[in-house]
C-alpha cells in the first residue's frame, strides 16, 4: 500500500511538472539568413494594459543542449512557475536552447575552465549572434521594461552570462552566473552590471576559482557584486542558489539608472 501511495504521489508530481512546463510556450526564432534558435517563453500570468514587465534571459548548461526545445527547462523552470513567484514577480522569461554542437559564448568548448586560461579575445559565437537578434525582438516590445533586463545561467550558461554582460553591459540591470568561469581580465567592461555569483567549493567540473576570480575582478573594477560559496557542494550549486530566500527579491529590485 505504501509503495502504491508513493507511486501515485510521484506520478502526480511528474504530471504537474509536465503541465507546468507547458506554460512555457514553444517558440523558434528564425533570422533573415535562415539561422534558427529554439526557445521557450513564459509570459506574465496577467498582462495589464499599458504595464511594463521585466525580461529574464535564462541560459542552461551543456547537458541541456539539443533540438527538442524541452531539455533547457530541466533546471530552473519550476522556480518561475511557483505560484507565489508568478504573482509577485511577473515577467517575460526566455529559456533558449543551445544547439548540440554549440557552446553559448564560445565557438567551441574551452580547453580549460581555469580563469587565467579562459580565452581573453572572444569572437561572437554563431549561437550568440542569433540569440542577440532574438533578444532584440523582445526589447522592441512596448510591454518590456528596458530598465529591468536580467540574465542568469548555470555552468556553460554562466559563462554565457558573463560574456553577454561584457558585450552588452548597457542592456542588463543584473546578472546571476552560477558555477561559471571567465577570464577575469574581460570583466572590467561589465562593471556597470550588478552581479550575484554562486559556486560550490567542491566543484570538480568548473573550478570554484572561476567565480572567486570573477568576484575579485568585478570588485576591483568597482562593480556592485555579491558572492556566495557553498561548502562541500559539487557541480550542482544551482539547486541551493535557487532556494536562497532573497533570490527573486534581489533580482527584481535591480534597475538600470
How does the language model describe each region?
Residues 1-23:
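Bacterial Sec-dependent N-terminal signal peptides
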Residues 62-128:
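Active-site machinery of serine-nucleophile hydrolases
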Residues 74-84, 179-187, 209, 213:
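Alpha-helical scaffolding within the catalytic cores
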Residues 136-191:
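Primarily recognizes the serine-hydrolase "nucleophile elbow" in alpha/beta-hydrolase
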